[in-house]
């Protein structure tokens, strides 16, 4: 088994999908949580000067959260059984990532840096919030219909197999649902899916024991 180190801030953010995949697979890894005060000094050491970054065997470095997530999903068996399955898992995951990305961008400063503060006002929060809301209006009905296509939406996006797509549904909507608990009231299948992920035998212990952070 390779050794893994996941580098990210002490927040869920764009790395949580990767942490959830490790938890679902039961694979040990070094969860390196970088303090924001450390970041300036180490930024240029990171590929693309960004995190998250996955380090494998202290030799290989993979940047970009969804590239990391896809790699782990393939390695651990959470990316579908064939190429068509993988394409379905990918487009579902990317749809939820669009929601996550637009949400987090409401808390970026003018230089594009994540502020990790709910009270932060970047001066264009209204415009960015409208974009986030439009993304949700565009994507959530489609995701509800997509889920219903397999077993009436009563299991997972791929039927009886939990994949990265289901984990993305959970983690991408965590903060938005904190802001608006009725967000999924028109999407009961998605709400039930998130409950299934939360009660999964591998996910439940992880979700209960992980660090509590704002983002």
UniProtKB/Swiss-Prot annotation:
It comes from the Eukaryota. Residues 2-80 form the GST N-terminal domain. It holds the Pfam family GST_N. Signal peptide: none annotated. Residues 82-215 form the GST C-terminal domain. This is S-crystallin 2. PANTHER family: GLUTATHIONE S-TRANSFERASE. InterPro entries: Glutathione-S-Trfase_C-like (IPR010987), Glutathione-S-Trfase_C_sf (IPR036282), Glutathione_S-Trfase_N (IPR004045), GST_C (IPR004046), GST_superfamily (IPR050213), S-crystallin (IPR003083), Thioredoxin-like_sf (IPR036249). One of its GO terms (biological process) is glutathione metabolic process. Belongs to the GST superfamily.
């Amino acid at each position: 088994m390779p050794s893994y180190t996941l580098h990210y801030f002490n927040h869920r953010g764009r790395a949580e999908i990767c942490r959830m995949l490790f938890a679902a697979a039961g694979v040990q890894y070094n969860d390196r949580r970088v303090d924001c005060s450390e970041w300036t000094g180490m930024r240029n050491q990171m590929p693309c000067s960004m995190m998250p970054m996955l380090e494998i065997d202290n030799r290989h470095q993979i940047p970009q959260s969804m590239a990391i997530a896809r790699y782990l999903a393939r390695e651990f068996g959470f990316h579908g059984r064939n190429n068509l399955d993988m394409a379905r898992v990918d487009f579902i995951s990317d749809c939820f990532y669009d929601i996550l990305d637009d949400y987090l961008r409401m808390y970026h400063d003018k230089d594009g840096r994540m502020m990790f503060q709910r009270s932060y006002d970047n001066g264009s929060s209204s415009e960015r919030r409208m974009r986030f809301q439009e993304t949700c209006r565009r994507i959530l009905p489609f995701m509800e219909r997509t889920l219903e296509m397999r077993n009436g939406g009563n299991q997972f996006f791929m039927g009886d197999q939990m994949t990265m797509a289901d984990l993305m549904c959970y983690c991408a909507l965590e903060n938005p649902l904190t802001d608006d608990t009725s967000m999924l009231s028109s999407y009961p299948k998605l709400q039930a899916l998130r409950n299934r992920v939360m009660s999964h035998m591998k996910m439940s212990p992880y979700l209960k024991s992980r660090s509590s952070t704002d983002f």
